[in-house]
Amino acid sequence: PVIWTLHDCWAVTGGCTHFVYNKCENWKTGCYRCPRCGNSDTGGELKGVFRTMPWVLRKKEAYITSVPNLTFVTVSEWLSGVVRSSVVGSVPVQVISNGVDSTRFYPRTDIQAIKQKYGCGNRFMIVGVSSHWSVSKGLYDYYKLRELLPADQFVVVLVGITSEQKNNIPDGIIGVERTENLDELALIYSAADVVTSLSYQETFGLTIVEGFACGTPAVVYDNTALPELVDSDTGLVVETGNMERLAEAIRQVCKTGKSFYSQACREVAQTRYDKFCQYEKYVELYEQALVPKKV
């Protein structure tokens, strides 16, 4: 038996890990007329590679469908739907979410030091976290959001910013370079009043769940897998790219207060997304896969 966990869309496309930002659905029928060709912002410098995508996808389809006892695991219902709509949609799919270590990510009480370290003061702290900030991750949307909220009341903190990006971000946004220190990251989540994802394409949204584990509500865009994570007890979902609605949602969370959401956020992280729960689901799947099939 083969269990293949998908964290992005590469397996079902001619080579793209994501396609939503480029508004492409060609992967459903063969990856012809690739919109990435010639677009330097999304990899057009490799347009020769992208022109081979139809051939690559045909090869993937042949190889994947030839495996007799294959099961895909996807990290969200959204990604599961993508697989089922693809050229390898006949392969069985099971959803097992990414997991969070709730013994490392938990509400911290010593948050004033981290607020002072980054100069947040007592302002409402809006946090976004990414390992790679780009246009499709919503970087410029944070710039726009900053202009819609009074700087003396709200502060935007972006974690994972490169040193080059840090030198170029607008006034009123605090850039924090990537940290491998989970305790510091948990402190930032705990200090935040809201954790956000303004990404245009996510197969899961682990930073949101890490924020939940630290008792922090979320505001996310209504695309791909993000809406699966958030309900009215844990935050708000807004129309992708609608900056007025986004600012309104931030103000609503501010008015309601973080404490209204915190317990539900922590419970969701522990009961639905704890990593040990996900391990158990994998063990169960492996055991099922090893049961001899009846002829």
Name what the model sees in each region.
Residues V73, G119-K137, Y143-R146:
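Conserved donor-binding/catalytic core segment of Leloir-type glycosyltransferases
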Residues P217-V220:
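Short hydrophobic beta-strand element within catalytic cores of glycosyltransferases
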Residues S259-L290:
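A charged, aromatic-enriched C-terminal amphipathic alpha-helix characteristic of glycosyltransferases
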